[in-house]
């Protein structure tokens, strides 16, 4: 598997992001979905990666800089056929490595509180994330779970 920075102009990446956004918004109450679309992922404060096996995109993920010391994981998604093969772990490792290298000391995320999002919450917990309160521009929301992790040594 290779992970490259970028890919937002590739229709295969856009198709996988469309699946991610559609599912995330479909499983969340109106007003509580925070998935970024392609235009937002192209923002100056966002670094985006795509994971590939051969010519097939198998995962995506992004890091949004909130402050000099704090980043947010966005748009993590693994293609259905590639689940269980370490794609998400590899993307998360790249995101955390980049965050550390840029001086961030904390990385956080927002995911849903509904059963559909349970695998995501379990994944992040396995990687050292703990639940926390809202951060950045988020507000308390019963449909959201906020998680964070200090970026000490890998």
Protein language model features and the residues they cover:
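Acetyl-CoA-dependent GNAT
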Residues: 1-74, 79, 92-93, 98, ...
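Conserved acetyl-CoA-binding loop-helix of GNAT-fold acetyltransferases
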Residues: 78, 84-97, 122-126
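Glycine-rich phosphate-binding loops of nucleotide-dependent enzymes
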Residues: 129
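Short hydrophobic/aromatic beta-strand or adjacent loop that forms the aromatic wall/cage
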Residues: 46, 142-146
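Conserved beta-strand-loop-alpha-helix junction that forms the acyl-donor binding cleft
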Residues: 80, 109-120, 138-142
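A generic structural signal for beta-strand entry/edge sites
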Residues: 68-70, 106, 144
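Conserved GNAT acetyl-CoA-binding A-motif
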Residues: 99-112
